[in-house]
Structures are given as structure tokens and as C-alpha cells.
């Protein structure tokens, strides 16, 4: 209703009182859901706005970030795909590439006994959909990196009939 009152007040200011009366009548005849922005119009606008901007020259972002130079120049990251969880049979979280930072100096907090660090990036893990994206991000920030290639498990061929083979000890007698 706020959008309706704003448009009516704008029409009143621009066209005078007579336009106000006709606008109020036309607003009353239009269902309220037609006044809201429909989802297909938003989706149409989003497809037009997804063009990428490419920059040919490499930009130095160190002055913009505010991160101390010791955290930028001497930083080493590890780019990898995490292994499958051994406790489950699913392969969730093994499709994305992760970037993990090296561990810096840690010390024990004398008051609480917690492990403390002065490194703001040590506990951060970044996720990327492609290895090339992670490498480009590391190069853009000036970090050296190690890439651990994705290990694809070799499928083992198994057959149901092998469970009942006469020359294999799959079933042990109890006597």
C-alpha cells in the first residue's frame, strides 16, 4: 500500500487534483498482486545483469585491503579437494576445491589455557567451484600456493555371486 500512496501523491503533484481522482479509481480496480514486481521480470533483469567485467591488467589490491604486509607477502596456501568422510558412504563435500592457509605461530593463553594466534587468516577456509578459480584468487592476492590434485577413487568390481563362491571362505561355520 505504501507504493500505491507514493504513486498517487506523485500523480497529484504532477497532474493536479483531477488526475488524483481517476488514479484512485484505476488503482481500486487493479488487483494488489499486479502492483508488486513479478518474479519473471526479476529473473529477466538478472540474466541481463550477469555479464562479467574483465580487466586486462593485474591490479595491486594490497593498498586497499588494509591487511598487514607480513600476512600478504609471506603467506602460503594449500589448494585441495577434501577427502570423503570415512564414517559415511556418501561423497558430499568432495566436489568443491578448498583453500587453506598455513599455520603461523601459536601460543597458550596464560589465563584460560586456550591456543591463541595473532594471524587473522589461520582459521579461514575458502571454497571454490574450480581449481583455476582458487589459483587465480591466490595469485591476485600475492600468495604462493601448493595444489594437491584431486584423487579419483578407482571403482572396485564386485558381483553378488562372489558371496556364494565355493572356493572362497565368505561364510565361516560355527562348529
UniProtKB/Swiss-Prot annotation:
Any Pfam family hit: NDUS4
Membrane topology value: Peripheral membrane protein
Compartments where found: Mitochondrion inner membrane
Superkingdom, taxonomy of origin: Eukaryota
Positions of modified residues (Phosphoserine): 173
Family: Belongs to the complex I NDUFS4 subunit family.
Subunit: This is a component of the iron-sulfur (IP) fragment of the enzyme. Interacts with BCAP31 and TOMM40; the interaction mediates its translocation to the mitochondria; the interaction with BCAP31 is direct.
Reported function: Accessory subunit of the mitochondrial membrane respiratory chain NADH dehydrogenase (Complex I), that is believed not to be involved in catalysis. Complex I functions in the transfer of electrons from NADH to the respiratory chain. The immediate electron acceptor for the enzyme is believed to be ubiquinone.
Protein name from the UniProt record: NADH dehydrogenase [ubiquinone] iron-sulfur protein 4, mitochondrial
Species for this entry: Mus musculus
Amino acid at each position: 500500500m505504501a507504493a500505491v500512496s507514493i504513486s498517487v501523491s506523485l500523480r497529484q503533484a504532477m497532474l493536479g487534483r483531477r488526475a488524483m481522482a481517476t488514479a484512485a479509481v484505476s488503482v481500486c480496480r487493479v488487483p494488489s498482486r499486479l502492483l508488486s514486481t513479478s518474479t519473471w521480470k526479476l529473473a529477466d533483469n538478472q540474466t541481463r545483469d550477469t555479464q562479467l567485467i574483465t580487466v586486462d591488467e593485474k591490479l595491486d589490491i594490497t593498498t586497499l585491503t588494509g591487511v598487514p604486509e607480513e600476512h600478504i607477502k609471506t603467506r602460503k596456501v594449500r589448494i585441495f579437494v577434501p577427502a570423503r568422510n570415512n564414517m559415511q558412504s556418501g561423497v558430499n563435500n568432495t566436489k568443491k576445491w578448498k583453500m587453506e592457509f598455513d599455520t603461523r605461530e601459536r601460543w597458550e593463553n596464560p589465563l584460560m589455557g586456550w591456543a591463541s594466534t595473532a594471524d587473522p587468516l589461520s582459521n579461514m577456509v575458502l571454497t571454490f567451484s574450480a581449481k583455476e578459480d582458487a589459483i587465480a584468487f591466490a595469485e591476485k592476492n600475492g600468495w604462493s600456493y601448493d595444489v594437491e590434485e584431486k584423487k579419483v577413487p578407482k571403482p572396485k568390481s564386485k558381483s553378488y555371486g562372489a558371496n556364494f563362491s565355493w572356493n572362497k571362505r565368505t561364510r565361516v561355520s560355527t562348529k
